[in-house]
Amino acid sequence: MGRDLGWCFFVATVLLAAVLLPAPTIAGRLELKNEISGVASVRKAKLAVRCWSNEDDLGWNMLKPKQSRIWKFTTMNMWPFQKTEFRCQFRSGFGTTNEDVVTVFSVKDGFRKQCGVGGDECFWVAKRDGFYLRRIVKDGGGDSRKKYVDVLKSKWVWKW
């Protein structure tokens, strides 16, 4: 009898944990887009980007105006292993971001909520006046287009 009760308690605990705990892994998506416009020189409108995670160095990429770079990955989202984080450096003809290194994706809840609805996708946009987080405020639903607002995170600054 005691053994059956212990077994039932164990099964109930496992089921409760499976329901209440977040999924240990999720599909993440990071997109960087160059929307620098109104510049006579294409060279000045290019965006140099170097990104890396805890495990991978994604190297330098050069984005011309209207180009984007997308990375898809699997995140680890189970305490105490919440570790998936991507950081980038940005250089444009207008300077660099205030911070030399910008965290552009993290599985930490506070960060993911900044990205908007769902929190598993983060969109960043370079414009002539600075660097923006494109926050999703409505996930299209029946309409296939997402609604978003661009939140200025850093004006371009000269550090050289």
Swiss-Prot record:
Primary residence: secreted
Highest taxon of source: Eukaryota
Keyword vocabulary terms for this entry: Secreted, Self-incompatibility, Signal
Ranges in a coiled coil: none
A Gene Ontology term for the protein's cellular component: extracellular region
Range of residues in the leader sequence: 1-27
Biological-process GO terms, alphabetical: rejection of self pollen
Alphabetized InterPro entries for the sequence: Self-incomp_S1
Annotated localization: Secreted
Pfam families registered for this protein in UniProt: Self-incomp_S1 (PF05938)
PANTHER family: PTHR31232, S-PROTEIN HOMOLOG 13 (PTHR31232:SF29)
Family: Belongs to the plant self-incompatibility (S1) protein family.
Name this protein carries in UniProt: S-protein homolog 13
Organism: Arabidopsis thaliana
